[in-house]
Regions:
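Sec-dependent signal peptide recognition
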Residues: 1-5
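C-terminal motif of bacterial Sec signal peptides marking the signal peptidase cleavage site
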Residues: 8-11
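Aromatic- and Gly/Pro-enriched helix-to-coil junctions and flexible linker segments
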Residues: 13-776
């Protein structure tokens, strides 16, 4: 039966294709590879791109864009759409990578990879450009339907769930799509474009979607990029090994020169050609894969496409940073006798591949921009999806072992020991799950060796105390970070936000490096479900190790109590691992505690110790709404089951008496009995322990809701939240304070948020993503 249905659908598609060919000619995928910049009243860069960015790329931006249609660049639009999902929890074989600007160099190449056009690739005339293009047809379909102006959208007609079935019609399938889903024009599930924006896009499409030549890189930017390329392509073995290490840690970075007035972002890529020649990209699934060339050159390529909040990771380059890197990697007295191989047993283990580089040098590179380092895990492709990200708690702090503390000598030994500990990186098949016990044994053996070393080192003045924590050298706010998980995504910010997190982690070089290679450099978003589960399971060990480091700062007699609270009702194998690991460290803390709540006390001492370098950006005391500070703190302090009805991440706009808008982020921190199980997270939820965190400004890339109120409504808003006892109660609160998907002011409000974001933090700002926006 299924075969007959498939055969019928294929026949219908072939017939539709024949009809289109008869009317508008044969499709030519190369048509937009070198588009003509024909005279047109509409400019792509001046008129069209601002619309496709603010109305289209906010849902169609990256790997998780519906149908892989990325609309943040001209090349993304001309590439088109695919029916294959990047994030597929059931994938048993590796998927061919589909990275824009990387895995195909022409639209014909993308057609061979299964992408279908959304622009007209047939004969170019006004009628064909409208009738034979999916994008034009979707815009027209939206304009033909009346969209609700209030209330909720029908759950029967609109599915906003993360793993919903996608409809990715080709032009041959579009008539059937429009007949079956007349309300599914674009933007999907959001208000239609304004008449002016609609006409701008229609006129551009009618003209054949012309585009101007790309703007050349400014001479000052070009020269500065050349200086860094020269630095990263030295001939000595030392310089080559340094460059390889830097690349494997910066490959996701958006590099910029912070002392130049113009802002251009670059990405570090591997090339077959040296500086001064056109880049010939070396493409590979992972940054440490064999480049298949005698010499790799590291080049700076301008970032193409719109910056997205969920992937934008700015990293400043300047002469001071170059000098520091040179002092760590070149001036340091060590010898590089040969370059490491790219074989899996070497390349997949950074403690083997870079053993010749002093550990302190490696640690310093990661530590100096620790937020960026952790952001690779948080913003990298691993963190899309609940199963991938539920390995961490909803709200925790991160600190780092001081690179110059005597305890680092033991870290050197541990880094050497990790040459024998494998990460589950390269294996993709189901059989690799059978090796899980082997990984567990290796980790247990490593922790025993670590405990032996620490028990010897943590004596006298070296007993665990706050001097062991890196203080940012007195001026670096990367010394302390806070992570917020929002169900299936997360955010990391500088500072110790809030008064007491759910848990915390302290990392030294070995742990930081392993997390990077497990979840950033070694993670394959196009890999199998087995590979992704292995990474998630192994991260359990690494998270526990970071928490184990925190427990060492507590009195011996308090450690079990705190640990058991973090791991309530955890599986027996997890508890056995925890008890074994924790019992191995018997040295007491060097901190003198004055209360019977040492975990709470430690959080306060930690904040006090790092106060000179803590980033206070997310402290409510800095808000301009000083007259309402008490109410804001009251909202921030709410906890319990009532707050569990709120979305994970909401942006609140509060207008003062002068009608000045002030933006805040409200985060719901979901409590769990433990985070050491893969599935059925809802069974481990503890809604009575949920808390809220309110911070000034915008934090996070995936808002679930927008709230708008004036400052005089704050008491009522807080009262209504306190009284939430059902989904129906939340619907009433939303009806009063939320800007829902159906609100005609939705786009104007989104524009105001983006304008505020760019105006306040122009370097880090990127487009927000509305794929998780609620319909409640």
């Amino acid at each position: 039966m299924l075969f007959l249905v498939a055969l019928l659908l294929a026949s219908c598609t072939n017939y539709a294709r024949h009809q289109l060919d008869q009317r508008y000619g044969l499709a030519n995928p190369a048509r937009f590879d070198h588009p003509l910049s024909i005279p047109s009243a509409v400019s792509y860069r001046r008129d069209v791109k601002p619309i496709t960015d603010s109305r289209c790329a906010v849902c169609h931006g990256c790997f998780d864009a519906p149908c892989q249609l990325q609309m943040g660049s001209y090349e993304g639009i001309t590439r088109g759409a695919s029916k294959e999902k990047v994030y597929d929890d059931l994938r048993l074989s590796m998927m061919a990578p589909t990275r824009l600007f990387t895995d195909a160099q022409s639209n014909a190449g993308w057609r061979l990879k299964g992408f279908s056009p959304v622009l007209n690739e047939r004969h170019a005339d006004t009628v064909a450009n409208q009738e034979a293009g999916v994008m034009a047809r979707l815009l027209k379909l939206k304009s033909q339907q009346l969209f609700p102006k209030a209330g909720l959208l029908s759950a029967e007609r609109f599915d906003f769930s993360l793993y919903r079935a996608e409809s990715c019609p080709t032009i041959e399938e579009f008539d059937g799509y429009a007949k079956q889903h007349p309300e599914w024009g674009m933007p999907y599930g959001l208000p239609a474009l304004s008449n002016n924006d609609q006409q701008t896009l229609v006129h551009w499409l009618e003209a054949g979607a012309p585009v101007e030549p790309p703007q050349p890189v400014a001479p000052a930017q070009f020269d500065r990029a050349g200086q860094w390329e020269t630095f990263l392509n030295g001939r000595s073995l030392k310089a080559q090994l340094m460059a390889r290490y830097i690349y494997e840690h910066w490959f996701l970075a958006h590099l910029y020169f912070d002392d130049l007035p113009e802002r251009t972002f670059f990405e570090l890529v591997r090339s077959k050609t040296p500086p001064g020649q056109a880049i010939q990209l070396i493409t590979s699934r992972r940054p440490f894969a064999n480049p298949q060339v005698p010499r790799v050159f590291y080049r700076l390529r301008p970032v193409q496409g719109t910056l997205l909040a969920k992937t934008h990771m700015p990293y400043a380059l300047n002469t001071a940073r170059m000098a520091r890197i040179k002092s760590w990697f070149i001036d340091e007295p060590y010898a590089v006798t040969e370059l490491p191989a790219y074989t899996p047993e070497v390349a997949e283990n950074p403690f083997v591949a870079f053993a010749q580089i002093p550990m302190r040098s490696r640690y310093r590179l990661m530590l100096e921009e620790a937020q960026f380092t952790i952001m690779g895990f948080i913003k990298g492709p691993v963190c899309r999806g609940q199963v991938a990200i539920n390995v961490i708690n909803d709200y925790f702090w991160i600190g780092f072992v001081h690179p110059d503390h005597p305890i680092q000598e033991s870290q050197n030994f541990l880094a050497t020991a990790l040459q024998q500990v494998n990460l589950p990186i390269g294996e993709q098949g189901l059989s690799s799950l059978l090796k899980w016990r082997s990984y567990a044994r290796q980790e247990t053996d490593y922790l025993r060796a670590k405990s032996t070393i620490l028990n010897q080192a943590l004596t006298g003045n070296n007993a665990p105390n706050l001097s062991m924590l890196w203080d940012g050298d007195g001026n670096n706010p990367n010394a302390a970070l806070t992570v917020f998980r929002n169900f299936d995504n997360a955010s990391v910010v500088q500072g110790l936000v809030g008064e007491q997190p759910q848990t915390a982690m302290i990392m030294g070089y070995p742990l930081l490096e392993r997390i990077h290679y497990l979840l950033v450099a070694g993670f394959d978003v196009f890999g199998t479900v087995t590979h992704q589960l292995q990474a998630r399971l192994y991260m359990d060990f690494l998270r526990m190790e970071g928490e184990f480091n925190v427990l060492a700062f507590l009195p011996v007699q308090a450690r079990d109590t705190v640990r058991d609270h973090w791991y309530r009702n955890a599986p027996d194998d997890v508890l056995a691992h925890l008890h074994d690991s924790q019992s191995l460290l018997f040295k007491n803390s060097g901190i003198v505690y004055k209360t019977d709540q040492p975990w709470t006390e430690l959080a306060g001492l930690w904040k006090q110790h790092l106060k000179p370098v803590l980033n206070q950006r997310y402290d409510l005391t800095g808000t301009a709404l000083q007259q309402d500070l008490g109410l804001l703190r009251q909202l921030d302090s709410l906890k319990g089951k009532a707050v569990s009805y709120l979305p994970e991440l909401a942006f609140i706009t509060i207008s003062d008496d002068q009608k000045q808008a002030h933006h805040f982020t409200l985060l719901r921190n979901s409590a769990h009995s433990n985070v050491s199980e893969l599935f059925k997270e809802e069974l481990r939820r503890l809604p009575d322990e949920d808390t809220l965190t309110l911070v000034p400004g915008l934090l996070g890339a995936y808002p679930n809701a927008f709230y708008r109120l004036n400052s005089r409504q704050l008491p009522e808003f807080i009262r209504d939240i306190k009284q939430l006892a059902s989904e129906a109660d939340y619907t009433k609160l939303s009806a009063r304070f939320a800007i829902r998907r159906t609100n005609p002011q939705f786009w104007a409000h989104a524009d105001a948020l983006h304008a505020s974001y760019r105006g306040t933090f122009p370097i880090e700002a990127g487009l927000l993503d509305f794929n998780r926006f609620e319909n409640r």
